[in-house]
């Protein structure tokens, strides 16, 4: 039974990792919660407009795409991107999930970012762009996680 549970947990984690692709950002919130539970990590959720929001694009370019952030995130966070693009196509299922999350977290602007526990409970949050590059952003996340 123990080996069976280990195998199932591994499958869930590997499936979630496959969904994440090279960027490390998941788009399936429920899969992210399962991965967070399995890996005992908090969730870092990013509400964004990847193809129209200037501050979101700047944050991606200057922080999230950088090796320093990606290495920290890989070891300490489960990343979730909740995107509201204007030009990029999304499945009806993804649109419905994102709309539900937008309402649940009462999003009023982009980017909005939260740290959540594995159950989806909000630990802390930020609205807007934070300057300073990946090193400053990682330090900010470390401070938030200490609380």
Predicted features along the sequence, with ranges:
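Typically the conserved alpha-helix immediately C-terminal to a functionally engaged Cys/Sec
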Residues: 55-72
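Thiol-based oxidoreductase modules, predominantly thioredoxin-like and allied folds used
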Residues: 25-26, 69-95
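Non-catalytic, surface beta->alpha helical segment in thiol-disulfide oxidoreductase systems
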Residues: 62, 104, 108-147
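Bacterial N-terminal signal peptides
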Residues: 7-15
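Short active-site neighborhood of thiol/selenol oxidoreductases, capturing the structured segment around
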Residues: 40-53
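Positively charged n-region of N-terminal signal peptides that target proteins for export
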Residues: 1-5
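Sec/Tat signal peptide C-region and signal peptidase I cleavage site
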Residues: 16-22
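A short beta-strand-turn-helix
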Residues: 25-43, 73
